[in-house]
């Protein structure tokens, strides 16, 4: 997963870059928070098989508070997805491997 800066995010969002190509998955996290550390292990295990189907990003809320603010992130871990058509969905909490795979497959199949 690639770290996402404010500049990169604004380019993707404003120019629509990647929105018609692949859906976007953003993991908002804090390095010091236990649930984020646990979810990171799940992400590291599951997401490599999706790199060709989904644009995968992570955002450290302490380093990029403006991106977190745009999505009104109040707690972490928090996952935000943007479908190919531009629909935004947010989910709070860590997922297990099975649920994450189900979630990612649903994101891929959404038009």
Model segments located where?
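N-terminal targeting signals for export/organelle localization
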Residues: 1-4, 109-111
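Thiol-based oxidoreductase modules, predominantly thioredoxin-like and allied folds used
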Residues: 3-4, 28, 40-43, 47, ...
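A short beta-strand-turn-helix
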Residues: 3-23
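Acidic phosphotransfer microenvironment of two-component signaling modules
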Residues: 7-10, 65-66, 98
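Short pre-active-site segment immediately N-terminal to redox-active cysteine/selenocysteine motifs
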Residues: 21-22, 28-32, 75
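Short, thiol/selenol-centered motifs that function as redox-active sites or metal-ligating centers
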Residues: 32-39
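Mid-chain, well-packed structural core segment of small domains
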Residues: 65-74
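Non-catalytic, surface beta->alpha helical segment in thiol-disulfide oxidoreductase systems
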Residues: 75, 80-111
């Amino acid at each position: 997963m690639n770290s996402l800066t404010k500049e990169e995010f604004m380019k993707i969002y404003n120019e629509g870059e990647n929105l018609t190509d692949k859906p976007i998955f953003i993991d908002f996290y804090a390095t010091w928070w236990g649930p984020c550390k646990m979810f990171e292990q799940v992400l590291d295990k599951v997401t490599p098989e999706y790199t060709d189907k989904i644009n995968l990003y992570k955002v450290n809320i302490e380093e990029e508070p403006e991106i977190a603010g745009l999505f009104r992130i109040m707690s972490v871990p928090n996952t935000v997805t943007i479908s190919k058509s531009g629909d935004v969905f947010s989910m709070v909490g860590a997922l297990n491997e099975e649920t994450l795979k189900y979630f990612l497959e649903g994101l891929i199949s959404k038009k």
